[in-house]
Amino acid sequence: MDTSLAEEVQQTMATLAPNRFFFMSPYRSFTTSGCFARFDEPAVNGDSPDSPFQQKLAALFADAKAQGIKNPVMVGAIPFDPRQPSSLYIPESWQSFSRQEKQASARRFTRSQSLNVVERQAIPEQTTFEQMVARAAALTATPQVDKVVLSRLIDITTDAAIDSGVLLERLIAQNPVSYNFHVPLADGGVLLGASPELLLRKDGERFSSIPLAGSARRQPDEVLDREAGNRLLASEKDRHEHELVTQAMKEVLRERSSELHVPSSPQLITTPTLWHLATPFEGKANSQENALTLACLLHPTPALSGFPHQAATQVIAELEPFDRELFGGIVGWCDSEGNGEWVVTIRCAKLRENQVHLFAGAGIVPASSPLGEWRETGVKLSTMLNVFGLH
C-alpha cells in the first residue's frame, strides 16, 4: 500500500523516545518497549556458563518466559572493565524494522535542534595526550607490553537539554552502514553511537567477528582516497598492530569452536571518515556457547586495550586521567536461544540532559607518532562531532 504524503512526513519527523533501546545492523534491526528486568551483574568471567553472570542471566530469561515473553532478549551495554556493573535489561517487547527503510527515512529527516556550546574541554589536553603516547610507545618497545590503546575525551556542555532521538536520525543519515545504537541508561542518560566494529555475531551454531585495528584518514579526492587506503594496507606499523589483535583472538576462539576460518591477510573497509584494516572471522561454536559467552571471551580485544591484556590495562590505568566506564565496552543483545550481536562501543557519545561526553582511542606501538595519534583520535571524534554540527 502506498504511503500518503502526510503519513510519510509524520514518519520522517518521528524520533525515538530516550527510554527505548535501538539497534541497527545488517543482521537484525529492532527497537524495544518497556523494561521487564534490569541486570547490572558485572560481566567478569561471563565467558563461562557457570559464572554468576551467566547463571543470573539464565534465571532472568526463565522468569521472563514464565511471564509470557516467548523469546526474551537481553539488551544494553557492558563496560570496558567487565568488573564494573553492566548496563543491561530485558525489555517487555521488541519490534523489528527494515534497516534499508530506516536509512532512507533518516536521509529525509528534517527536524533539527539548535544547540549552543557553553563549554568544551579536551581530556586530556593535546600536550598531555602526546606525552602519554610517547610514554606508551616507549613501553611497547620493551618486553613489558606490545601494544597499548590510549583514549581521550571531549566534554561538552550545551545551553539546553539534548534530544537523543533527533541526534540518532542525524547519526544514521551520516553513518548509514555502521552498527547504530541508542542505549537508555539507568541514570537517565543515553549511550549513542555508530560503531564500525563487530565484536561477535552468533546465529544458531555459527558465529562471526570482524576486528578492526590500523586506520587512515579518508581523502575528499577519489584517487588520493584510494592511495590512502593502499598505503594503510601496506603499512608495516598498522599491519603489526592488526596482527596482534587477530592472533590473540584466534588463540581464544580455537578452544571454543569446532571450526574457525580466518584469512591470512587483512582487508580494507571504510567509514565516512576512515579506512580500517579488517579481518573477518567465521566459525562454528561449541554447543554450550551463547552470544554473550563468546562476546565476554573476546572483550576487551587488543583493539581496545592492547596486548598482553593485563600489562596493557595496567598502563592504561596509569596514563589515562579518567575511567572509561562504558566507552570501549560493548553494546548489543543476546536472546534466550543464544543468538545475538555485540559491537564495540566506539564512535560514540554519552548524553545526559545538557552534557555530552565523546570518546576516541588509538593503538600505540613502537612506531606510533604522538602528533599522529592525536590527529587520528581527532578524526575518530569527528564522527560524533559532525552529528552535533561541531568540528
Please identify what each model-predicted range represents:
Residues 49-158, 162-163, 258:
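Non-catalytic accessory segments adjacent to catalytic cores
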Residues 280-391:
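Conserved hydrophobic core element of enzyme catalytic domains
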Residues 153-154, 185-191, 249-251, 266-273, ...:
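A glycine-rich phosphate-binding loop feature that marks nucleotide/adenosyl-phosphate handling sites
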Residues 23-39, 157-240, 244, 257-260, ...:
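An anion-binding catalytic pocket shared by soluble metabolic enzymes
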Residues 1-52, 156-161:
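Short Lys/Arg-enriched alpha/beta "domain-start" segment
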Residues 32-34, 39-41, 95-127, 133-134, ...:
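Contiguous alpha-helical scaffold segments within structured protein domains
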Residues 19, 72-78, 148, 180-183, ...:
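A short glycine-rich, hydrophobically flanked beta-strand micro-motif that places a catalytic Asp/Glu
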Residues 76, 143, 200, 247, ...:
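A residue-level signal for conserved active-site and pocket-lining positions in enzyme catalytic cores
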